[in-house]
Amino acid sequence: MNTFRTTALMAVMIVLFALIGQALGGTGGMLLAFLIAVGMNGVSYWYSSSIVLRMYGAEEVSRAEAPELHDLVDRLRRRADLPMPKVCIIPQDQPNAFATGRNPDNAVVAVTKGIMDVLDRDELAGVIAHELAHIKNRDMLTSTVAATLAGAITMLSRFALFFGGRDNNFLVSLLMMILAPMAAMLIQSAISRSREYAADREGAEIAKNPLGLASALRSMERAAEHRPMPANQTTSHMFIVNPFSGGLSGIKRLFSTHPPTEERIARLEEMAGRAQ
């Protein structure tokens, strides 16, 4: 399913670029836009992991440097029947985490310094298991391509505004510039929300402790309000909790890249109740 979803996102980006290129520059513009879109898809597939890690200053740590974290990841990845991912630490105080990589053999689990300080071992196990569930389901490439598509839509809207030409085209381009970021966020949220619920459920199964993950989500959501992290909007959906704010309400929920944390916690608590 995720392979189909990723392919569809790549195809959407190519078609979007080609259509805008055709509108702005005829056949030549369409060909140029097509080549740019193919190039962006290639970069997204092969290099997105290193780009995202560099963006957040994540550094790979060895077992000698972080033995407890490595042991925890190793124990849980064996339980999930996965290859050992690289382990990275992000130098940020906000407790958060994400997984990246184009497939399980090239996966990375990145956690912030803050998560090591705030969460206890059971909570951290829940978070790591959640990220391993993303790896097992091959969610990382889908989320990365979604981030690329979101950035591409925004870039196209700005490009169209400056090269729109006539008044009618200018008005259309201006409208596109206003609506395109909303469309990009809706694409991200539609993909991210279903991914997060599934990773919560499967992560709780891997860790064998739904309440540990529920407690972690509650602590991270609370900390996000008081420990801001410089994050990029196009990659915010990759994190286990929204890095920009604690609670969301009203219209913000529609465009949020994450499901409501209280709903995620409620589902995990219900899951724990059924297991008793």
UniProtKB/Swiss-Prot annotation:
Q: What Pfam families does its record include?
A: Peptidase_M48
Q: What keywords were assigned to this record? A: Cell inner membrane, Cell membrane, Hydrolase, Membrane, Metal-binding, Metalloprotease, Protease, Transmembrane, Transmembrane helix, Zinc
Provide the E.C. number(s) assigned to this enzyme: 3.4.24.-
- What cofactor does this one take? Zn(2+)
Q: Which GO terms describe its molecular function?
A: metalloendopeptidase activity; zinc ion binding
Q: Which GO terms describe its cellular component?
A: plasma membrane
Q: How is the cofactor bound?
A: Binds 1 zinc ion per subunit.
Q: Where in the cell is it found?
A: Cell inner membrane
Q: What is its main location?
A: membrane
Q: Which residues cross the membrane?
A: 14-34, 145-165, 171-191
Q: What biological-process terms (Gene Ontology) are attached?
A: proteolysis
- Please indicate if the UniProt record lists Hydrolase as a keyword: yes
Query: Catalytic residues?
Result: E131
Membrane topology recorded in Swiss-Prot or TrEMBL: Multi-pass membrane protein
Annotated binding of Zn(2+), by residue:
H130, H134, E196
In terms of PANTHER family, this protein maps to: PROTEASE HTPX
Q: NCBIfam families, per this entry?
A: PRK03001.1 (NF002826)
Hey, which family's this protein in?
Belongs to the peptidase M48B family.
- This chain's protein is named Protease HtpX homolog
Q: Which gene encodes it?
A: htpX
